[in-house]
From Swiss-Prot:
Belongs to the metallo-beta-lactamase superfamily. Glyoxalase II family. GO terms for biological process: glutathione metabolic process; hydrogen sulfide metabolic process; methylglyoxal catabolic process to D-lactate via S-lactoyl-glutathione. Zn(2+) 1 binds at residues 72, 74, 148, 166. One of its GO terms (molecular function) is sulfur dioxygenase activity. It is an enzyme of class 3 (hydrolase). Zn(2+) 2 binds at residues 76-77, 166, 208. Substrate binds at residues 175-181, 208-210, 284-287. This is Glyoxylase B2. It comes from the Eukaryota. Its EC number is 3.-.-.-. It comes from Dictyostelium discoideum (Social amoeba). Binds 2 Zn(2+) ions per subunit.
Length: 292
């Protein structure tokens, strides 16, 4: 079996998200990772323009999606997973089993309908730590990497590439915030160290990039480069230094612009909230709840 993947990245620029297609060229099977449903907050409209780019590429290259993967319950964009599942009904939607914790937390915050399940059943598959699965002939290992959220997982194609979601970012950007409910800087440190123990030649694919002005947007680096120069987590940084930096920095951050709409859609695996008796679906906004 081959274990070299072809990766195509489709940036969604509003949320700086790197939608990805992970391809096994031997079998033409693929997985879609961290897709986006476009959302315009000032008029409450959704569109599928960026997810449609994935569909067009898959069709043009005659690929067969086996998985629609999430690295976590995103708080900065709406997931395109439900839309894509409608296009590819045989592809399995999947996320880490920690999604159940996020569902339970936000069911209470949003005061959702009593019938909303918090067992992760909106997804076809909940991965456990160290679980294995395949994309065509590619062997993939799930690495539980909580800290940013309890649901975070990374997907590791052995000796080739790892998809880390919102754990670490590009070396000049650093790491993800840990101030969401059930987040933890100490837990994130432990999770990132698991990733950084992988071989130095492994390519690291990040979910977001917020580049400084002197470079363009990009979504991959290597384990070696992260260990050498990631400004938050390079080898010379101690655990105590990281926790202090991350905690102090998080205290200054405002909530992501699309936090409130994103989570209540993404805990449903990208499906919009159920329509009410007038045929309209609504996003709920908890007033005076967030810290800032």
């Amino acid at each position: 079996m081959s274990n070299k993947a072809k990766i195509e990245v489709f940036p969604e620029l509003e949320s700086a998200t790197g939608q990805m297609i992970i391809i096994d060229e031997q079998t033409k099977k693929c997985a879609i990772l961290d897709s986006v449903l476009n959302y315009t907050q000032n008029n409450g409209r959704t569109s599928t323009k960026d997810a449609d780019k994935l569909i067009a590429y898959i069709k043009e290259n005659q690929l067969e999606p086996e998985w629609i993967l999430e690295t976590h319950i995103h708080a900065d964009h709406l997931s395109g997973a439900h839309y894509l599942k409608g296009i590819y009904p045989n592809a399995k939607t999947a996320i880490g089993e920690g999604a159940k914790i996020v569902q339970k937390t936000f069911k209470t915050i949003y005061n959702l309908e009593h019938t909303f399940p918090t067992d992760g059943s909106q997804f076809d598959k909940l991965f456990t730590d160290d679980e294995r699965f395949t994309i065509g002939s590619l062997q993939v290992r799930v690495i539980s990497t909580p800290g940013h959220t309890p649901a975070c997982v990374s997907y590791y194609i052995e000796n080739d590439s790892v998809f880390v979601g919102d754990t670490m970012f590009m070396p000049d950007v650093g790491t993800a915030r840990c101030d969401f409910p059930n987040g933890s800087a100490e837990t994130l440190w432990t999770s990132m160290k698991k990733i950084l123990e992988l071989p130095e030649t492994v390519k690291v694919y990040v979910c977001h990039d917020y580049p400084p002005q002197e470079r363009g947007i990009t979504f991959f680096t290597t384990i070696a480069e992260q260990r050498l120069s990631n400004k938050h987590i390079k080898d010379s940084v101690t655990k105590d230094e990281f926790i202090k930096m991350r905690t102090e920095r998080d205290a200054t951050l405002k909530a992501p612009q699309l936090l409130l709409p994103s989570i209540q859609v993404n805990i449903r695996a990208g499906e919009l909230p159920p329509k009410e008796d007038n045929g309209i679906s609504y996003i709920k906004i908890p007033l005076n709840y967030l810290k800032q």
